[in-house]
Amino acid sequence: MRTLCSLLLIGCLLFSYDTPVVGFLRRSVSGFQECHSKGGYCYRYYCPRPHRRLGSCYPYAANCCRRRR
């Protein structure tokens, strides 16, 4: 019984926190969502001529571009 409880406790502790990969994925998704919520799109290279750069999209450091009005 003690062994079972110990294994259960170890399993809960291992899976209860976010790993660094999960934090990285959350930042990357939030970067894309933030760009799209501003009306932009993620473009890997420089923004085309009539567009301007709003920021960057994670994880590839792509540019968040939006057309000038």
Curated annotation (Swiss-Prot):
It comes from the Eukaryota. It is found in: Secreted. GO terms for cellular component: extracellular space. The gene is Defb11. This is Beta-defensin 11. SUPFAM superfamilies: Defensin-like (SSF57392). The keyword Flavoprotein does not apply. Its main location: secreted. GO terms for biological process: defense response to Gram-negative bacterium; defense response to Gram-positive bacterium; innate immune response in mucosa. Disulfide bonds join 35-64, 42-57, 47-65. Has antibacterial activity. Keywords: Antibiotic, Antimicrobial, Defensin, Disulfide bond, Secreted, Signal. Belongs to the beta-defensin family. It comes from Rattus norvegicus (Rat). Residues 1-23 form the signal peptide. GO terms for molecular function: CCR6 chemokine receptor binding.
